[in-house]
Regions:
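Generic detector of well-ordered alpha-helical segments enriched in charged/polar residues
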Residues: 7, 11, 109, 140-147
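Intrinsic disorder/low-complexity segments
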Residues: 20-22, 32, 148
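N-terminal regulatory/effector-sensing and dimerization cores
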Residues: 24-122, 153-154, 158
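A short, N-terminal "cap"/entry segment at the start of jelly-roll beta-barrel domains
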Residues: 1-26
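A ubiquitous short alpha-helical element
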Residues: 14, 123-134
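An amphipathic alpha-helical interaction segment
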Residues: 130-175
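Surface-exposed loop/turn and secondary-structure junction residues enriched for glycine/proline
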Residues: 17, 99, 111, 131-132
Length: 175
C-alpha cells in the first residue's frame, strides 16, 4: 500500500503560526494524518491549497466562514489558499485518518495556466467531491501518486508535479 511510503503524522498539533507558513518540504506535500487524542484543529489559514480525503475512521466536520461541511469517508474537500477553516475529527468514530495534500500557490498557478481553463470555472469556495466522483476518477490514486514525486530526480520532479496538479484541476472541473 502506497500510504506506508509517505509521512504519517499522529495527533499532530497545528498552531496558527505553523499553518500560516509557506510549505517547507516542496511544492506538493502529501501526508497521512491520524487523530486519536487531538480531536480538533485551531481555526487557521495557509498560503497553499489543501485537499483532504478521509480514508478510515471518523467523518470529519469542517467549519469555513460560518458554513459547516461534514466530510464522509471517501469524499474529498479542496480549500483554496488563505481560506480560514477548522476541523473536528471525532464525529462518527474515535479515530480519523486523512490523506492530506498541500499544494504551493506557484505550482497551482502554473497548472491552472497549463489546464487552459478560464478563471470563472471555480469561484474560490471550498470544493467537495462525493464518493462516487472520487472513486470514478480515482482521486485517491492520483493523491497517492503525488506522494511519490518526492522520490523523483529533481530534474523532472517539478514537471511531473505540475502535470499531476493540472490533471487534478481538469478532473475537478469535470465533476
Amino acid at each position: 500500500m502506497i500510504l506506508q511510503k509517505m509521512p504519517h503524522y499522529v495527533d499532530s498539533i497545528l498552531t496558527q503560526e505553523d499553518a500560516s507558513a509557506a510549505l517547507q518540504d516542496g511544492q506538493v506535500v502529501v501526508g497521512l494524518y491520524t487523530n486519536r487524542e487531538n480531536v480538533q484543529s485551531v481555526v487557521h489559514s495557509h498560503p497553499y491549497y489543501e485537499m483532504i480525503l478521509p480514508v478510515a475512521g471518523s467523518s470529519v466536520r469542517y467549519s469555513v466562514d460560518g458554513s459547516v461541511y461534514d466530510l464522509h469517508l471517501g469524499e474529498l474537500i479542496l480549500f483554496p489558499g488563505e481560506m480560514y477553516h477548522s476541523g473536528k475529527f471525532n464525529i462518527t468514530d474515535t479515530t480519523s485518518e486523512r490523506l492530506v495534500v498541500q499544494i504551493a500557490p506557484g505550482i497551482w498557478e502554473r497548472a491552472w495556466a497549463q489546464s487552459g481553463l478560464p478563471r470563472h470555472v471555480w469561484s474560490g469556495d471550498p470544493v467537495i467531491l462525493d464518493t462516487d466522483a472520487v472513486t470514478q476518477w480515482d482521486f485517491r490514486g492520483l493523491l497517492e501518486r503525488m506522494a511519490q514525486t518526492v522520490y523523483l530526480d529533481e530534474k523532472i520532479r517539478d514537471t511531473v508535479q505540475c502535470c499531476e496538479v493540472t490533471e487534478l484541476i481538469l478532473l475537478i472541473s469535470q465533476v
